[in-house]
Amino acid sequence: MKLTCVFIIAVLILTACHFIVADDTGDREWRDLEWLRSLKAHDKRAGCCPTIMYKTGACRTNRCR
């Protein structure tokens, strides 16, 4: 019983911390993901690779100038 209570309290604390941290970083990660998707869409349309993706090796087409 004591172990169960400790586990539940730990989960609640971790969940609260996650939401406090995710409030800022999660939103930023989501924007970064959307930005990366738009870069990939741009890459397919233009036939060139944005510099940031070219450097990471995410695409093998010509780098955009």
Curated annotation (Swiss-Prot):
The keyword Transmembrane helix does not apply. It is found in: Secreted. GO terms for cellular component: extracellular region. Contains 2 disulfide bonds. Residues 1-22 form the signal peptide. Residues 23-65 form a propeptide. Expressed by the venom duct. Keywords: Disulfide bond, Ion channel impairing toxin, Neurotoxin, Secreted, Signal, Toxin. GO terms for molecular function: ion channel regulator activity; toxin activity. The cysteine framework is I (CC-C-C). Alpha9/4 pattern. Belongs to the conotoxin O1 superfamily. Probable neurotoxin with unknown target. Possibly targets ion channels. This is Conotoxin Cal1.2. It comes from Californiconus californicus.
